[in-house]
A protein has these predicted regions:
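Amphipathic alpha-helical segment used for protein-protein interaction
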Residues: 3-35, 45-53
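DNA-recognition helix of helix-turn-helix
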Residues: 33, 39, 48, 53-79
Length: 79
């Protein structure tokens, strides 16, 4: 029984660990990038909808989303 407890305590849910790391990556983004990333990725809004919500030009949002994706990739690779 002790061995089972020890083995169970060493169990790592890698899917959950990756999800936590992904959330940490998102939280590390500058606010503007984080907002556009969340609205685009999670809420699946198009740039025109996000533009109306944030009062920001769609072109600017596209740039922010691009940089957000790059920073998330970098975070996931290096941390």
């Amino acid at each position: 029984e002790l061995m089972n407890k020890l083995m169970a305590s060493d169990y790592v849910d890698y899917d959950n660990a990756m999800a936590v790391k992904f959330q940490q990556a998102i939280l590390s983004l500058p606010e503007k990038q984080r907002i556009v990333f969340n609205l685009r990725y999670y809420d699946e809004l198009d740039y025109e909808e996000i533009s109306r919500i944030t009062d920001t030009r769609a072109e600017t949002l596209k740039v922010n989303y691009h940089y957000a994706k790059e920073k998330i990739k970098e975070y996931m690779t290096n941390n």
